[in-house]
Structures are given as C-alpha cells and as structure tokens.
C-alpha cells in the first residue's frame, strides 16, 4: 500500500500552544490548536474563530449523595456547552476521578467538530462528575446520577442538550438520567439522552456503532489506496466495544486480523485470528491473552509490520518515542486522541496515512442521532435500517473529507477539520451575532 505524500506538519502556527512539548497537551489545548490549524486553510472571519475558542456556557454543580453507610459525600459535576449554531448540544457524560472543567470544555469542542464533520444537526458538549465509579455501589451510582440530573435539569433537554454514555457510564446510567428528568417534567422524555437500553427508547446498534464506523472507514480507505481487503493485515489495540466490533467486521469482510489486545497484552497470530472465538472485554473482561498461543506486549503490537493499525484503546499511545517505529501503512483511530501532535507530524513526514478519530469513530454520535430521531418521532428502527443509514452517513462524510484531502494537499486529519470548521463557520455567518 503506497501512501500519497501530503502536508508535512499538523502543528498549530499560532504559537499559543507548544505542540511538541514534553508534557501531553490537555484536551482544551489540543482542541484550540486544531481549530487554529484548520482555520489557517480557510478564508473565514477570524471573529468566528475567536468565538469558537471558548465554550458558550460551563455549568458547575455540587452533588451531595448519601453513601450506603449513612454518611454524606459531596462531588463536583460539570456540563460544558461549546457551540450550538448547528443544533442542540450533544456529548457524553463521564464518571472519572480526573474529570475537570477544562477537560470537559476541550472534549466538548471535539464534539462540535465531530458532529460537523458528520453533518449532524448538533453542536458539541461534554460533562461529567469527578468520582471513581469503581468505588460506588450500584445504589450509590444511581443516587449520584439522579441528583446530578436534578442539578443540570434546566440546561439539558431533547432540543437543548442531549447527553450520552462515556467513560464510567453506560446504558443503565442513561436510563436513570432519563427517568429522573422525566419525573420532573411530568412526562416520559426519552429524547433527553441517547445510549439508553432499547426497552426505554434506545436504538438497536448503538453500542456497536463506533466499531462499525471504524470498520467502514477502514474498508473505504483501503479501497482508496487500491488495497484489496482480502489481502490486508490488521492489528487492533483494544478489544472492547470499539476494537472488538471493528475487528470482527473486518474479519467477516475478508481482512486478516493478526493481533488484538487488552490491558494484559496482545494475542498475535500471523495467519489470522478467528475474532468471533475471542471474547470482547464486555463478554469476558481482560481475557484476550488467555486465548493466545503467542503473547506480545501492547507496545509491540503498535509496531507490527501490518497494512492497517487500529489503536482502539487509550489516548496518546502513538507518541514521538514510537512514531518512527510504526510499520503500518495506515492508522485508523478507533480511540479518541490515540496519536499525539508530535507523533502525527512524524507519521505525516513518513507518508503514513492517519485517519482521524473525529471521522473514524463517529458512528457512536451518528447512531445517537438516529436514536434521538426515533425518540422524538416515537418510532423504532430495525437494526438493519440503523446499519444501512450509518453506512450511508459514513460514506457521505468520507467523500467530503476525501475531496478536501485531494483538493488542498493536506493530511487526512487536516481535511476532516477543514470540513468541520467550514460547516460551522458557514452556519455562524448565516445566523450572525446578536445583539
């Protein structure tokens, strides 16, 4: 697979953030740098860029809950609403001890770009609670969720801000949130959140969607580079919802999956893995290596000589320390932010194509959009329809990004951000600034 040479750098030219600092960028620094960089390719009003540097609103709340032992503990929660020029805010809610205001702002900006590159009628938001969910009993987690919902009830809603699951939350969390909101509204309002169980208004195919979109984009980019899928080797870091679903679909479509991994290490089989026979993290946590004849480290997986590398676990796993050793021709980002900015530049210099997360794993927010449509219309879709509609949306987004990639001679990441920012800027131009 031969990659075309493109832009040799994805660094921000504004100088506001040190893209090659020894310290990892914060989510907010990264989002702003990507904004400046995309804007440098476009003839847009710099006043719009200035507005997009900041969230429209950030809500900070205190959440007192009674623990199972009768004591009361107070947690801090956030909901950062970045931009709603194209529609209601949309983004996840995470429960993690490291949740901060700035993290929510930065991730909310990323959601703005992701929704725009997919041409969804949403803006970006992100929220969460600074708590370790592993230290909560199910009853405590429910009380936390319901109280958090009450604290942010006035700033969320089907036409205002629609949360979804994220790190430390799941469909059950969303069901509690929907119920707490509905009880206060006096009517069942399933469209207030997405990622719910189907029995209470969730969509078929929602949990599998990010992995499915990664597989679809991998197939499309292989076609673009004249790489037959049945002659393509793939390594997948992470075997959770994203990695497992992507690996199994690509396996089904004819690719050879030579490595998969979890936190304990990687299973390596040069002749190909029967992905259906290896349980995902959801099916049997941290079990990948117990099914392996040959075990390698996660670090070794990243540098395997394969056609396609799919980092689908953690952020910042491809760094300046290992970017020169990446042997894959193509990197498809299944995780959020798996490639640091410095590594991105190194890979671009080496003509390694990197398909960015805001395109590749956008299946999650896209099927969340489908779920929202089903909720407000009170009509459920079949799994077949969900998957067909997702494929159509991914192909449309791919075509838009591909056109910018070819016309502007930029990297795939730059092309995706150019598509997103041009759509957002056009909406701001049309709506204007009031008063």
Curated annotation (Swiss-Prot):
Residues 14-23 have a biased composition (Acidic residues). It comes from the Archaea. Inhibited by ethanol, acetone, acetonitrile and 2-propanol (65 to 70% inhibition) and to a lesser extent by methanol and dimethyl formamide (26 and 49 % inhibition respectively). No effect of glycerol or DMSO. It catalyses: L-glutamate + NAD(+) + H2O = 2-oxoglutarate + NH4(+) + NADH + H(+). Optimum temperature is 70 degrees Celsius. The enzyme is entirely stable from 50 to 70 degrees Celsius and 55 % activity is retained after 30 minutes at 90 degrees Celsius. Keywords: NAD, Oxidoreductase. The keyword Glycoprotein does not apply. It is an enzyme of class 1 (oxidoreductase). Residues 1-28 are annotated as: Disordered. The N-terminus is blocked. GO terms for molecular function: glutamate dehydrogenase (NAD+) activity. Its EC number is 1.4.1.2. Pfam families: ELFV_dehydrog (PF00208), ELFV_dehydrog_N (PF02812). Gene3D superfamilies: Leucine Dehydrogenase, chain A, domain 1, NAD(P)-binding Rossmann-like Domain. The keyword 4Fe-4S does not apply. SMART domains: ELFV_dehydrog. Optimum pH for oxidative deamination is 9.2. Optimum pH for reductive amination is 8.5. The active site is at 126. Strain NRC-36014 contains 4 distinct glutamate dehydrogenases while strain NRC-1 contains only 3. GdhX is only present in strain NRC-36014. Homohexamer. Belongs to the Glu/Leu/Phe/Val dehydrogenases family. This is NAD-specific glutamate dehydrogenase A. It comes from Halobacterium salinarum.
